């Protein structure tokens, strides 16, 4: 096992050195380079499970980053952390901000739908069928958008939509 870990550490270090070299020679403004470095450090912290540190790096990156696609990716990663921490409302809010920056992120829609579907299951377990239907309908709405953006990419969601009767025939066109 240690040999695999050493190999993985070597690959991580090699990738970091290569990425840093590329960033140094790229013909981009210093501000954009700093934004990328904060993003990269946030991603590393997130991958290591240090979510509070990752959020700090991501916030610094957002202060500098101007590219909407990159901002959307950073916000999506922040939303994933909030979702992992059980901060569902903040996660949804952050996913929605990510979609404003870059509307072509089906994974944001998928994850919002997961939260809504979870709330629907919870309402059902508590016997509140009206509330269940509200949450399931909201899940179906965002999941339908995700499936349109990424056809065939979320087969489990497509099946849920069909099996729950919440699939529209034009969804797959």
From Swiss-Prot:
Pfam families per record: TPR_7 (PF13176), TPR_8 (PF13181)
Keywords for the protein's UniProt record, in alphabetical order: Membrane, Photosynthesis, Repeat, Thylakoid, TPR repeat
GO CC annotation terms, alphabetical: plasma membrane-derived thylakoid membrane
Membrane disposition: Peripheral membrane protein
Places the protein is found: Cellular thylakoid membrane
SMART domains: TPR (SM00028)
GO BP annotations listed: photosynthesis
TPR repeats: from-to residues: 35-68, 72-105, 120-153
UniProt function note: Essential for the assembly of the photosystem I (PSI) complex. May act as a chaperone-like factor to guide the assembly of the PSI subunits.
Family, per entry: Belongs to the Ycf3 family.
Protein name listed in UniProt: Photosystem I assembly protein Ycf3
């Amino acid at each position: 096992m240690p040999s695999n870990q050493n190999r993985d550490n070597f690959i991580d270090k090699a990738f970091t050195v290569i990425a840093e070299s590329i960033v140094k020679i790229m013909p981009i403004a210093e501000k954009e380079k700093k934004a990328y470095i904060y993003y990269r450090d946030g991603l590393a912290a997130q991958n290591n499970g240090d979510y509070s540190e990752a959020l700090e790096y991501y916030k610094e990156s957002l202060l500098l980053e101007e590219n909407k696609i990159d901002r959307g990716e950073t916000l999506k990663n922040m939303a994933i952390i909030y979702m992992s921490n059980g901060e569902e409302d903040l996660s949804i809010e952050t996913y929605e901000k990510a979609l404003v920056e870059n509307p072509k992120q089906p994974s944001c829609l998928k994850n919002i739908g997961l939260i809504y579907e979870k709330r629907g299951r919870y309402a059902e377990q508590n016997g509140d069928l009206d509330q269940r239907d509200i949450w399931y309908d909201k899940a179906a709405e965002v999941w339908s958008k995700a499936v349109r953006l990424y056809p065939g990419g979320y087969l489990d969601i497509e099946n849920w939509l069909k099996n729950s009767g919440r699939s529209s025939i034009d969804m797959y066109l």
